[in-house]
Amino acid sequence: MAKKFNYKLPSMVALTLVGSAVTAHQVQAAETTQDQTTNKNVLDSNKVKATTEQAKAEVKNPTQNISGTQVYQDPAIVQPKTANNKTGNAQVSQKVDTAQVNGDTRANQSATTNNTQPVAKSTSTTAPKTNTNVTNAGYSLVDDEDDNSENQINPELIKSAAKPAALETQYKAAAPKAATTSAPKAKTEATPKVTTFSASAQPRSVAATPKTSLPKYKPQVNSSINDYIRKNNLKAPKIEEDYTSYFPKYAYRNGVGRPEGIVVHDTANDRSTINGEISYMKNNYQNAFVHAFVDGDRIIETAPTDYLSWGVGAVGNPRFINVEIVHTHDYASFARSMNNYADYAATQLQYYGLKPDSAEYDGNGTVWTHYAVSKYLGGTDHADPHGYLRSHNYSYDQLYDLINEKYLIKMGKVAPWGTQSTTTPTTPSKPTTPSKPSTGKLTVAANNGVAQIKPTNSGLYTTVYDKTGKATNEVQKTFAVSKTATLGNQKFYLVQDYNSGNKFGWVKEGDVVYNTAKSPVNVNQSYSIKPGTKLYTVPWGTSKQVAGSVSGSGNQTFKASKQQQIDKSIYLYGSVNGKSGWVSKAYLVDTAKPTPTPTPKPSTPTTNNKLTVSSLNGVAQINAKNNGLFTTVYDKTGKPTKEVQKTFAVTKEASLGGNKFYLVKDYNSPTLIGWVKQGDVIYNNAKSPVNVMQTYTVKPGTKLYSVPWGTYKQEAGAVSGTGNQTFKATKQQQIDKSIYLFGTVNGKSGWVSKAYLAVPAAPKKAVAQPKTAVKAYTVTKPQTTQTVSKIAQVKPNNTGIRASVYEKTAKNGAKYADRTFYVTKERAHGNETYVLLNNTSHNIPLGWFNVKDLNVQNLGKEVKTTQKYTVNKSNNGLSMVPWGTKNQVILTGNNIAQGTFNATKQVSVGKDVYLYGTINNRTGWVNAKDLTAPTAVKPTTSAAKDYNYTYVIKNGNGYYYVTPNSDTAKYSLKAFNEQPFAVVKEQVINGQTWYYGKLSNGKLAWIKSTDLAKELIKYNQTGMTLNQVAQIQAGLQYKPQVQRVPGKWTDANFNDVKHAMDTKRLAQDPALKYQFLRLDQPQNISIDKINQFLKGKGVLENQGAAFNKAAQMYGINEVYLISHALLETGNGTSQLAKGADVVNNKVVTNSNTKYHNVFGIAAYDNDPLREGIKYAKQAGWDTVSKAIVGGAKFIGNSYVKAGQNTLYKMRWNPAHPGTHQYATDIDWANINAKIIKGYYDKIGEVGKYFDIPQYK
């Protein structure tokens, strides 16, 4: 069965490789139940509701009742009808000894449009079972015993299971010349819109190939099942299409319509059917979906093979077609399913111009098993279909041999099954088409246009070879055109329904009115429209496609959501008064008041597209390479300019057609420079300047600029003098997220980044005695879970403890009564407020209590102290916890009275202070009221000192201050919670440590040390015990591996796995803890520190700013990003990183312009340097910094944005143990954690964000 041009010729839509969908897909799909919400944007916003309803219907009734499905024939192929001449049957030679196979000899046949296999006549898309009454005579239990010995192929002898040297000569001699276009595949439509074409149409017949012109195929493995298939001349059924509209469509890594091979899967479900599998997949497509399913009776394609699917993990998804074999249970059904799979696989290979090449033994080729992908490529850990095939006494090698044979038959290299071997051609029976196709060359190309069929026409053609067309009533309607075909002097268009995509057929060029069309784009704009204006179901619609008319009196509001250009006219789709449809923009009036352009209108505009102009407040620097300055946006070409690499003000932006322009002017004067194209500038948003009166210190040598964000061409001078100088600022402006100040220093004026300024140290003041009391606790009702620092005593009579605030019934809380616990979280639910109690070690949450059942006080920050005290005669004893009850006493008051208490830390509880220390060789807490200090020590206030460290803000309920210890000038930290805070100064006032530094928005502020943390650790409950998850891992078919002897891998046992997975143990290790580091969270490591680390790292040296920008822009941990780049570039020394150009498809390393690739993106193994540079050139990475920032988007989407965002999750996947795991080595996460920890040590930083799973 051959694929048909109607469906399978790729449209080859051009993709912008920078951030293209080749990596945007859910890279781990089919291996884990990750959230796929990042792909929801593939749904057309105007059709979400409709497609959702359609999806429900499709799932409820998949691929059924479609016996009237249309069949579209390949325009390039005329199919012969097989005759029943019994003389000289070209049956395939029987079992050939595997020793004959020469794995180094490969048949290099090219794709051809010849196909001698007929399509069976059928009135249903479900092909009838072939030979249903055949017994299992060919099957014996003996085969089960010697499956391995008989059918096992020596990987040293064979690479591709059907490529003997003997056949190579025969096939070359007999092979026809390959056509320029690969043969497409035949398809069926699930919901035909017209009945012009019948699914039961008799295939056309032509004179057969001479019977002696083709050799017999010699099987390369012994297979009773393959012999059974050949002997019974089993035919594959038609390919049914059951596409689902809401499945995403992403390109393969090489582009749309460019898969690199096919992967064999089995469903691993003995009790499911093909309909059941498809229905399940549609309901769970966010986790996985494949291209097709095959069983003994049907081949159902569920997703277009021109686009990737989510079936084989991160590495394989962008490369391969994925097809599932549905389990069957008897000999004949299994044989039919193997025949069907082999036919479908051979069809795909033929169509896409690929040759069979098994990847099973070396990881290179076009035919893969899921196991081979797991073994050689990774990104998945499945091992199918080997187990299922073995259960039927079959093997992959036998299936590959069948695929190879099918391919050679389709390519006209070997004789089809059942054909006669004499040279007498078969006689065609009642051909409906000429006995021989046109000798004219056929060319087919993708098209994106629209057409209306004229009332007088030649009809619709099933293929472009048809002598006559079939009459049609689909005239004077607008259809989408998806392909153009030229055969000889005739040109045809393939027309389809605009909204559903259902194919109608081919029409001659002279029978239509054709217009070019651009792809629709989403818009959000309102217009006014007159009553009575007609809406249409399609753009450029006719009177037969009216969707309704605008009702009401007076102008109505038309809300447009989509726009498409047909020829030079614009059509918009939208809604008005409850009716939706398309209307020409000529009937609409923009409700927004247009802003006049600042330049004269041209006398002869070059386009009819509407010009939109809007005010803008930004700044831009013109790139060294640009299209020049434009006097008006209508100008065809710009004028060369020397005003490059300078910062200008941007006052307006304009859009005309597909181009966007900025109007740039001199920053300090009203002088207009001209219009520049968007791609020719580096643009940043800017806020309006504001006047300030502030004084800073600035270091000598700091450069001043004539404009904010100025370049080296706009320097106004440098700060003179020795020692810090005083900079008096009078103006401030924010550019993007950076603050620039204009001021004067030593008689020079100019702009400088706030990062180069420091606030002068405040004069010392006398400070009051520190207060030990903490404000009394008051109940608040947070709407979300809040992190708090409090302490609580559980009342004897309480309503119980809850695992969640949503639990209606609490469990008995008697064992917690009359005890003190730490409170870490607080949440309101309904009219009640609950708090989360933790045990005395702070680490283990116990459950939620209603605050009505507690006595709660605020808990201060623990402060280190070194002091000896004498315990008063009357005291409350030594307790396990501050403010502990009698049930938590370690030593009674009598046991510690008059003793010496050595305190090491203290904490405030409400108005009391508790000290922690040692007495009588026991440690615990004592109320400060029960202690007497030998002498009172008056606290002192330290001067502010330099202190460089990046903390994490941990208290969203806290405040940041303009000056420390101020009760008035303070602002909420809620917006900055869990964000980094880069500290530059430290000061202690009244016993409280304050830090001065930069918030994530660039603002400088003071924050209490109690509101900061060196690291932010979050614990997530898995809902399982450690024993449970370890048992799952240890019980996998492919066991976790361990090296007990260096270089020798063995299966890890249960105890090995449990030890490796123990998160409590790992979290205590300072290095191994880094396997919990969040790789999707930037840490704001300073550029200086990054540059220090990158010193001597080749072209990556001094690229700290680029890594910092990339981390912030795409949400990636800087250290992880840097480690990735160092690994890929050999510490920045590879030629790929140093840069080159590709000219005439050759790498040029000494070119003036070089393109860089620092992450090895698209550097495929066959030619990594050329391919990697080609990708970089297409992406425009002509500097190392561009390669870092641009490549980071790829890295983020491909690796750390797929849900498993820590090394531990990558290795063990605690959310779904045993599935989608990156490695089998139980030490993999430990090794990589130590590497990343080592990088942090070299940079002089520590990890900030950790996510630790917890087991019950």
Curated annotation (Swiss-Prot):
Domain GW: 443-517, 519-593, 612-686, 688-762, 784-859, 861-936, 943-1017
Residue span of region N-acetylmuramoyl-L-alanine amidase: 199-775
Regions of compositional bias (Polar residues) in chain numbering: 103-138
Pfam families named among the record's database cross-references: Amidase_2 (PF01510), Glucosaminidase (PF01832), GW (PF13457)
Disordered: region residues: 103-151, 173-219, 419-440
Keywords: Cell wall biogenesis/degradation, Hydrolase, Multifunctional enzyme, Repeat, Secreted, Signal
Entry remark concerning the domains of this protein: The GW domains are responsible for directing the proteins to the septal region.
GO biological process: cell wall organization; peptidoglycan catabolic process
UniProt PTM comment: Undergoes proteolytic processing to generate the two extracellular lytic enzymes, probably at the septal region on the cell surface.
Protein name (record): Bifunctional autolysin
Catalytic activity: Hydrolyzes the link between N-acetylmuramoyl residues and L-amino acid residues in certain cell-wall glycopeptides; an N(4)-(oligosaccharide-(1->3)-[oligosaccharide-(1->6)]-beta-D-Man-(1->4)-beta-D-GlcNAc-(1->4)-alpha-D-GlcNAc)-L-asparaginyl-[protein] + H2O = an oligosaccharide-(1->3)-[oligosaccharide-(1->6)]-beta-D-Man-(1->4)-D-GlcNAc + N(4)-(N-acetyl-beta-D-glucosaminyl)-L-asparaginyl-[protein]
